[in-house]
Amino acid sequence: MDICMDKEPDGVVVYANGDSCNPNQENVSEPLLDSVSRDDANVHTELRYGEENIEVNEYDVKECTSEIPVGKPIGDDFESKDVTKSSLHAKHASKSGRGNNKTRNTVPQPFSLATEKRASSTRSFTSESLESAGLKKFPDGHSKVQSQATKVPRKPLQPKNKKLSDEEDSCSVASYATSGAKSAKSRTVVTAAPSFRSTERAEKRKEFYTKLEEKHQAMEAEKTQSEARNKEATEAALRQLRKSLRFKANPMPKFYHEGPPPKVELKKPLPTRAKSPKLGRRNPKEGNRAKGASRRHETRKTLVISKEDHDDETTRNADQINHKEMNRNLEPETAFAC
């Protein structure tokens, strides 16, 4: 059996056929023997890893003592010796176990036992490594804790073509069923009546419309009030303008109130009556009489005609007298006409 240990964090892979240590190859022909051999190899590699850690610790202690010549504490020597003894005992046990595996036939065991054995071996190794990497006392008298990271190799990967057994499938189905039942019990919801939001929306809409109506009414009232105020202001401005348009006249003079001066009344003579002339042949006597009558009418005086004298002399003298009187009466009328 060849053991191939890689220092990568993927761990250690052991092959029973003696092939090259390629971690990608898979041995499918002998799965049970491969698993047992891998467990033994893991134990052996873990022990070797513990020995390397112990040797490193001893080397560090020796360097410290060589640099500073101070007496080593006794407790550290005893602890280191105990660790070396336990590691040697584990080596002998692993060698004897490998020889027995070659001679005896392997018995098929379930996968669970191999995992338990691997877990127990890792626990024992970690406890030993922690004891070895404990407190270290330095010669200056101060105690310091040196924590070394214990690298635990990973478990080998299972081959890809392995399938779960029927028992594991049944267990997984049963566990899934139980978990589903528990979740169903925990998910029990109390039934309640459905609450519709349409009623709430209708109420909100109604409130909104009422507020809108109130707002519109307030705006209309304010508008009417503003119109009334503007009307009153315009009327007051018109009144002031009319008052300013009235003009004030100065008092009239005295002669306007007094009447015109009285007019002098003129005495007019009475109007004369028109008389149509007699047309035709006239006697000389009648002609003279007509002339005298016209003159009398013109002078507006009645003349007393004496008895007709048959004598021409008497008539001529009377005519002359009347003619003089007429001239005297006509003088004031001609002066007024001018």
From Swiss-Prot:
Keywords: Coiled coil, Cytoplasm, Cytoskeleton, Microtubule, Ubl conjugation. One of its GO terms (molecular function) is microtubule binding. Residues 74-84, 306-331 have a biased composition (Basic and acidic residues). Induction: By light (at protein level). Down-regulated by dark (at protein level). Residues 68-204, 248-338 are annotated as: Disordered. It is found in: Cytoplasm, Cytoskeleton. Its main location: cytoplasm. Signal peptide: none annotated. One of its GO terms (cellular component) is cortical microtubule. Residues 210-240 form a coiled coil. GO terms for biological process: cortical microtubule organization; negative regulation of unidimensional cell growth; unidimensional cell growth. Expressed in roots, root hairs, cotyledons, hypocotyls, trichomes, flowers and siliques. It comes from the Eukaryota. Residues 97-109, 121-130, 172-189 have a biased composition (Polar residues). Ubiquitinated. Proteasomal-dependent degradation in the dark. Belongs to the TPX2 family. Microtubule-associated protein (MAP) that regulates the orientation of interphase cortical microtubules. Binds to, bundles and stabilizes microtubules. Required for the organization and stability of cortical microtubules in hypocotyls. Required for normal hypocotyl cell elongation. Acts as a negative regulator of hypocotyl cell elongation in the light. This is Protein WVD2-like 3. It comes from Arabidopsis thaliana. The gene is WDL3.
